[in-house]
């Protein structure tokens, strides 16, 4: 009998493997990405203090998005989180793709964050 592979369980294992080697510091916090079917979320986290420094998502009303599950929306989120992080004095981050492939919405968010002042 063939069992169906749970994609999210595989992603969680991949994310745990990556997180064991990756941590955000005070000088270089972690830019974490979570992607659902409808939304994308990004936050800049200082793992030493356990504090979120900046966050943005497609659920934010001030972004004024018509659709929340496409590449353009992800780019707006990347732009917003980068601007908030730069305002807080964060220039360099460690990118945590959350176990997702660096493609599509995740890549669009990362590229927009780079264009708006974050280095990774």
Swiss-Prot record:
GO CC annotation: cytosolic large ribosomal subunit
Matches recorded under InterPro entries: Ribosomal_uL18_bac-type, Ribosomal_uL18_bac/euk
Protein keywords: Ribonucleoprotein, Ribosomal protein, RNA-binding, rRNA-binding
Superkingdom in the source lineage: Bacteria
Protein's job: This is one of the proteins that bind and probably mediate the attachment of the 5S RNA into the large ribosomal subunit, where it forms part of the central protuberance.
NCBIfam families found in the cross-reference section: L18_bact
Name this polypeptide is given: Large ribosomal subunit protein uL18
Lineage, top ranks: Bacteria, Bacillati, Bacillota, Bacilli, Bacillales
């Amino acid at each position: 009998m063939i069992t169906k592979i749970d994609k999210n369980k595989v992603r969680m294992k991949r994310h745990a493997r990556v997180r064991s080697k990756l941590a955000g510091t005070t000088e270089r916090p972690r830019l974490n990405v979570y992607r659902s079917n409808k939304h994308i979320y990004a936050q800049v986290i200082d793992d030493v203090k356990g504090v979120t420094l900046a966050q943005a998502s497609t659920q934010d009303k001030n972004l004024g998005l018509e659709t929340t599950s496409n590449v353009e929306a992800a780019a707006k989120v990347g732009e917003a989180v980068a601007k908030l992080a730069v305002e807080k004095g964060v220039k360099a981050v460690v990118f945590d793709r959350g176990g997702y492939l660096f493609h599509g919405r995740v890549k669009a968010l990362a590229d927009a964050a780079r264009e708006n002042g974050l280095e990774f």
